[in-house]
């Protein structure tokens, strides 16, 4: 969501397998000329010549095919983590990006925060000496507090289930 807020960004398309996704509509209302698609392949084929950068925030199992499809069209790509489910696919993306001179980034925002940069600097400079043991904790509840299994429900009519499943 932050990317489309930047003053130098002109959003030309949004894609979601669920055509009733509320966030999409708020973005479309702010970017009047942007088009909405349910299939990223259709979006890339239709808008390919109008796109410089693609941001991929699809279900994890579709990151590799969506990223590769965008790069094959010569697009710079920002992909949410995990980049791929297989190391070979990650290497293939890296090699392809290097060969085509494409800028790519995988979203791991927390590692770029000030405390991590501060710590990394002090480790590299030898300021804190040899590290023998590390204790880690998180103030966030990363666990799930709900029911152990989701209740059965019908697929919403607005969601293209096959597109969402992708390569799963």
Model regions and ranges:
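N-terminal glycine-/serine-/threonine-rich beta1-alpha1-beta2 phosphate-ribose binding loop
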Residues: 1-76, 88-103
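Glycine-rich, acidic and aromatic/proline-enriched surface loops and short helix-turn segments
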Residues: 60, 166-167
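A contiguous active-site-proximal alpha/beta segment in oxidoreductase catalytic domains
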Residues: 76-78, 84-159, 163-166
């Amino acid at each position: 969501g932050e990317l489309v807020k930047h003053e130098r960004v002109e959003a030309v398309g949004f894609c979601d397998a669920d055509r009733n996704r509320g966030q999409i509509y708020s973005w479309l209302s702010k970017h009047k000329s942007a088009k909405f698609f349910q299939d990223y392949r259709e979006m890339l084929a239709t808008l390919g010549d109008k796109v410089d950068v693609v941001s991929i925030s699809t279900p994890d199992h579709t990151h590799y095919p969506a990223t590769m499809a965008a790069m094959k069209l010569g697009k710079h790509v920002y992909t949410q983590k995990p980049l791929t489910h297989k190391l070979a696919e990650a290497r293939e993306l890296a090699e392809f990006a290097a060969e085509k001179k494409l800028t790519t980034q995988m979203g791991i925002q927390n590692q770029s925060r000030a405390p991590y940069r501060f710590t990394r600097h002090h480790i590299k400079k030898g300021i804190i000496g040899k590290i023998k043991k590390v204790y880690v904790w998180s103030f966030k509840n990363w666990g799930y507090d709900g029911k152990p299994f989701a209740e059965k429900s019908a697929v919403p009519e607005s969601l293209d289930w096959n597109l969402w499943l992708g390569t799963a």
